[in-house]
Amino acid sequence: MDRKNDGLRLMDGAGYKKIIIACDSYKGCLTSREVNEAIASGLKEWNAEDASPEKKNLHSEDASPEIITLEMSDGGEGMLDAFLSAMKGELVRIHAHDALMRWIEAEYGIVDDTAIIEIAQTAGLALIEPEQRNPMKATSWGVGEMIMNAYRRGVRRFIVGLGGSATSDCGIGMLKAMGDDWKKIRRECSFVLASDVTNPLCGENGAAYIFAPQKGADAKMVQMLDDRARKFAEVSAKHFGYDRSEAPGAGAAGGLGYAFLQYFNAEARPGAELLLDEVGFDALIQNADLVITGEGHSDKQTLMGKLPQRILEHVLKCRESDKSHVACSQLAGDCKS
């Protein structure tokens, strides 16, 4: 791969026919869609300014490049919008309960036979006022309500984004909301979890010790939550004859990951990778000239499986297998080494 020539080609823009923009949200600033649209708008303006015979930067012959924008998410903020935008699904609005059992309006998506659920729609930390946050009281009941609503509509496959939860109840609230129907759901449905969290359920690296303080827990609460999680896992293991509490991702979303893994035999996958696969990203970039990605804050964590890194891996794989010359560029709101 001639990376030097790629750099020159990226700077002069010559011959671009197809550009794909796939950025994550710039958290607290811009959504994925807003970032993508801003970049696309800038490219179009640059293209228009340089359309004279003497200055043809993005033009190939006399045609403007095709610009495709893809909303992206790592399984947390924006996952629902990303799936529905890329796959043209249906948005469903229901009344459900938040983590403090207050009635709210929640949304999930249906794409073909698959429900796209963000647990933060009901169990989200952002829905709870800072002074009200208490993981000893917060429940995942509303997640169960969303799943039951989709199940009654005939959905049997679920993609569940586990980011942004206010809860540490190990999914007990979700299971209670399902009632005895959880057994039918276990038999009939499949679940894929979108999460980059690999922590186990219990212990110093578990859900309570690592994540509960961010949700309002003090040191005493953390110990109590960890004890409660351990006891729940012991009871569940005796019932099923196996234990998933140590599985990677069991500690995600206050133990909701564990409930899905233990009770529904869910498959856990990195959120960004799951989305890229579901939208057919590899096929989209096969004849592209440039892929632009990015996130709000870029540092060493970016190289540990964050969206820009995964997109770069897909681009390099495409180059190696198809011998194409697609270039990849990252834009970040803030960079640290």
What spans do the regions from the language model cover?
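Acidic, proline/glycine-enriched N-terminal capping motif
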Residues: 3-5
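N-terminal loops that bind phosphate or other acidic moieties
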Residues: 7, 11-54, 60-337
